[in-house]
Design a protein with these regions (language model features):
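Basic, ligand-binding patches in group-transfer machinery
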Residues: 1-132
Length: 132
């Protein structure tokens, strides 16, 4: 059975000139069956709203998802920020065709179309024998 193991997640600094906050829910050590990875979280722009999140591998945007999912945890952390309530995103990507060792840059796309790095996710594809 093919699995994808998340090896490491490195997040950028929370406070920046363009991002108010971000969170990734991919957990190191997580094994995903088949050839897919699911990455969820939330992101808040500071002066310009985050409208999408992209996964980039070797300078190519592999997947883009809108920032529009209900995120009560972000709303609780930033109660005075209106867009915090719907600052969530979900990315489900197939890693077929990528090298066995995978690295994704996770970047926010702001309303003005600037990109801001959220973090880096390293993973690997491997085969696991089924238990008897």
């Amino acid at each position: 059975m093919a699995v994808v193991e998340i090896l490491d997640i490195s997040l950028t600094e929370t406070v920046s000139a363009r991002l108010r906050g971000r969170y990734l829910r991919a957990v190191p050590g997580t094994l995903n069956t088949a050839h897919t990875m699911e990455i969820t979280g939330w992101v808040l722009g500071r002066e310009c709203s985050a409208v999408a999140v992209e996964l980039v591998n070797k300078c190519n945007v592999c997947l883009r998802a809108p920032v529009n999912i209900h995120s009560p945890d972000a709303a609780a952390i930033y109660p005075g920020v209106t867009e915090a309530a719907y600052s969530g995103f979900s990315l489900n990507i197939s890693v077929l065709g990528l090298t066995p060792e995978i690295e994704f840059l996770v970047q926010a796309v702001l309303k003005d179309q600037n990109r801001v790095l959220i973090g880096v996710i390293r993973a690997r594809r491997l085969w696991r024998l089924r238990s008897a």
